[in-house]
Every structure is written in C-alpha cells, then in structure tokens.
C-alpha cells in the first residue's frame, strides 16, 4: 500500500513515499524547484513521487488547526491552511489525510528509523504547533510525551534570532553562525546574550540589541550564542536522562544539526541516533511513522532522485590526482542537508590551497570549515571522535594531525567527520580505499555539490551547468 508523508508550508518542504515498511523515495522540494529551502511542493517532485504509484493515504507532518491557534496567540493574524484542499486543487490528488503532531513527527522519524527497541527521544527546534522542545519515551508501538517546553521560550528561535542579529539569514544560515564561533570570545557578550535567552521573546528577532554598538564583534556574538545554547542543551539532556531509564537517545529537530554541541549527549547516554534529516524536511517520513507506529527499514539516506550509472571511481581518482578537486553526482540523492558521497564535491585534504579553492568555487566565506570523509577503521587514528562512528557528519572531533590535513581542520582544531564503511556505501568506501593505497591518505574533503544559496545538484543538467559555470569536472 503506497502512502505519502508530506512536510510543507513553513520551510524545507519534502515528500516521502513508503510501501509498508519499505522507504521507496524521500526528497526535498528545493532539489526540484532550484529554490533553497523551498517551503512548497512543485509538479516535479509530485511527478517523481508518482513514479512509485498513486498514494492511498497522505500523512501530514503537523496539525494545522493547532498552528492556526498559535499564530493567533502570537499576534500573527488568522491564516488557516487546509492541506487536503491544497493537494486536490493544485495536484488533483484526493485521498484520505491523516495528521500527526509536529514534535510527534520529529520523534517518530528518529525512533522508527533507529535500531533501538526502546529509547529516550529529545526533540529541539524553533517551534512546532506550540512545543519548542520535548522529551519522549518510545518503545515498540508506544510513544509517550513526558515533558515539553512551550512557545515563546525556544532554543531554536534563540539561535535563529542571533543568526539574524549578525547579518545572516535565519532558518538557513545557522550553520554559518556555528562556523563563526571558533573566531570569537564567548565571554565578551555572554551576559547580554544570556539575558536575551532568559528574558526576551525572540520570535521577531533581536536586531535592536546593542543597536548603538558600531563595532559589534559578530564572531564573539556567535561564540556567546553557542555557549548559551550548549548550556541549555545540556540541561535538557540531564532532564531527559532523569525522566527516563534508557541508555539510548534519539536526538531530533533542527537543533540536532548543531554538530558542535552533539558530543555533550555522550555524557548522559551510551548510544545515540540522529536521523540524518532531523529537521522539518525529515518529518515527511516522520508523519508516516507517527501515524503507523512501526519500524521503517532504514538502509541509509540515499533515497532521492537517482542519476548516472556505475559509480565513476576511476574517473574520480584520475581527476583527484590531476587537479585535487572533483564533483560526483551519482545514484539516489541524499535525503537531508549533508552530501554524503552521491552529490559531493571531493578534494585532497592535504593541500594548503585546497580550502580557499573550494570556497571560491562554492562562493562561501573563507572562514567556513569543510568536512572529511574517512574509512571508519582509520577514524580513531586521526580524530578524537566522541562516538564510534559518525556516518552522517553529526559530530565534531579534534584532528590529531591538523598540519597534515589543513583543508578539513577548522580554526578551533576540529573537523565535522563523516566515517564510512563498505556496508554503508561500498562505492565511496572503495574510492577512499584506492585513494589510500595510492597516496597513504585515508580521507577526502567532502562538501555538497552546490554553491551558496542553491540546492544540491539533482539532475544531469544541474551537473553539466555546475561543471561549465565553475570549472570543476563532475562525473555521474
């Protein structure tokens, strides 16, 4: 029975298609429209989903009526959205709809893709219908919400407001703010930033804060923001551990993408699972899981539109040896914000000029860090990882030999590591293994195959355009 899950109407729209326990397709609307963080569906993604058959039911990722009430309470006016009418009017799809709560969808997306029989689930985001953080106890088909933080208090809104305050785009550039932290002094504005968290409703931002300070050190604002976030994150972890008796933690919501903070969770839980699309886009999958309350067969994040033939290992190696930088667009696209080998820009991490060259190609700020992808069995030799494996770039780790790999080490000496095994991605693993035999280097720089402000490559035309515009060979 074909069922769809949909997340749309706020930001990062997506569709997931399942048949029983099998995940057949999951992708982001932005990959088809070309509009970064696209909030709405489009004909292209609908048609891609329809290739797997007409849906018998659609699961929606939140409860629109509750969202309408929250908007009224927040003074944002009356605006009610009817998902079923929208799908019928725009796409001629008229099937039964079933709704799940916003945080319920987050929690279910995490738990029902994990390998845990039972777990504590911690969800942290900007805002659901009313919840902004929640703690759940999940076991089998049972999900029980034990506690929640309510709007307007919100760690996600706090982080987004501070992102806006330093001149970046909220709900999009939070990862840039995280990269700025290494260049700032967390104590310089700590008292003021903590005061904003404790005393202000930050839903409409905080641009007036220190508005007369013409010499505002935005890097130190970022550092103070991260410090406050980590302090409050740890409080939530402690509360979650106290309220449950599980050693397993599922971490979900957009804040689970804060890889600089995620290591804190290892102090309180033995095993941690973060579904690689923990934000709202992942809730298209979560809505299905929340309503059906059964495990989905998670085989990895490669669930999107497929392109190319055999993974072009030899071509990639030749170009890496020749120019040091190459693109790959092959197989099903990653479901989530990280490129994990199928829509990647790969580079030799040893070159002193590689980081600047890749930043120039991607039109990014020069202070931005890049991630390494490394064979899992070599990871502990080169990085102090807080977990055994990090297949989805969800944790930072200190590099033991930063001078050897300048392209993938941030200013604070850390790297956002992706480990890979043959079972997880045999082609990427074989590429790394051959690269290692050729060079003695077991890793590559791995970043997404896109430029700032644009989605990842999603078609042969996208790949050709990238190659022609930016002078980088892209192989499919």
Where do the protein language model's features map onto the residues?
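Phosphate/ATP-binding catalytic cores across multiple sugar-kinase/actin-like superfamilies
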Residues: 223-249
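Short acidic-aromatic active-site loops that bind/stabilize oxyanions
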Residues: 97-100, 215-231, 421, 425
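Short glycine-rich phosphate-binding loop at a beta-alpha junction
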Residues: 54-66, 97, 245-254, 327
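Active-site cores of enzymes that catalyze phosphoryl transfer or operate on phosphate-rich substrates
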Residues: 179, 185-227
